[in-house]
Amino acid sequence: MILTLTLNPSVDISYPLTALKLDDVNRVQEVSKTAGGKGLNVTRVLAQVGEPVLASGFIGGELGQFIAKKLDHAGIKHAFYNIKGETRNCIAILHEGQQTEILEQGPEIDNQEAAGFIKHFEQLLEKVEAVAISGSLPKGLNQDYYAQIIERCQNKGVPVILDCSGATLQTVLENPYKPTVIKPNISELYQLLNQPLDESLESLKQAVSQPLFEGIEWIIVSLGAQGAFAKHNHTFYRVNIPKISVLNPVGSGDSTVAGITSAILNHENDHDLLKKANTLGMLNAQEAQTGYVNLNNYDDLFNQIEVLEV
């Protein structure tokens, strides 16, 4: 069983418009409302590829219940921790090939709720074999909250796949308890090191070999349409991917995380892990819906990916 954590989920609302009229009424004919958040995208893709998955995180109020009902409808198991605050909305206005987003900050977690979730998590940890943590921390949690979770996973021997950025990731990296996998994109990688971006192979090798990343088994760096670069222990890989028609790239990173987590759970070899992860990321990009993959195209893309030891 895989446990996914989305500590700051949202109800994602999409409003497609022919044109956005400012200071005027805009009428929308079709509205999409989904259970949102990076970890829930990971959850949906894991369920689609047939992995046993359990979703957790903080939810509150009617919007929190909406998320739970959406997962129920999709047949996805969940064990959320209920809080006093209200789960947030995140609104995307799609207009003239552009996307304007309005993102609520979300609820503030108090000390009692923060401690309560850790106890809740410890109980869930007894019955899972891998944990995928995605996205931002809600307001009120200490910056080292993910580090506390990772410490408990490490003590139980449960691998952790972590997808976050900025100060939250920096805090984890400076902590003695390390995740099994991190998945920064190339910009995030060099921001962590406070270095100018350099896409050359030698620079990437040097970057992921810095002391900041010591103790992390897998570092998988997204290079967008150029594929990926990875380090597994002391081995480096370059992943070349085919050109595809991209319909909606949002959620492709989360789908990649789902592939990594699935491969870790199933003890797949390095080449298959990297190919599965990138295949699912590309499949998501070919769909309008976020966190959705059409597995009919899986084998075709999988077989076109080239993984080279460098």
UniProtKB/Swiss-Prot annotation:
Q: What class of enzyme is it?
A: transferase
Recorded GO cellular component terms are: cytosol
Residue ranges of coiled coil: none
Which reaction does this enzyme catalyse, per its entry?
D-tagatofuranose 6-phosphate + ATP = D-tagatofuranose 1,6-bisphosphate + ADP + H(+)
Q: In which pathway does it act?
A: Carbohydrate metabolism; D-tagatose 6-phosphate degradation; D-glyceraldehyde 3-phosphate and glycerone phosphate from D-tagatose 6-phosphate: step 1/2
What Gene Ontology terms for biological process does this UniProt record contain?
D-tagatose 6-phosphate catabolic process; lactose catabolic process via tagatose-6-phosphate
Kindly give the InterPro entries that the UniProt entry links to this protein: Carboh/pur_kinase_PfkB_CS, LacC, PfkB_dom, Ribokinase-like, Tagatose/fructose_Pkinase
Protein origin, superkingdom: Bacteria
Q: Which UniProt keywords apply?
A: ATP-binding, Kinase, Lactose metabolism, Nucleotide-binding, Transferase
What's the family? Belongs to the carbohydrate kinase PfkB family. LacC subfamily.
Record protein name field:
Tagatose-6-phosphate kinase
Lineage here is: Bacteria, Bacillati, Bacillota, Bacilli, Bacillales
* Gene name as annotated: lacC
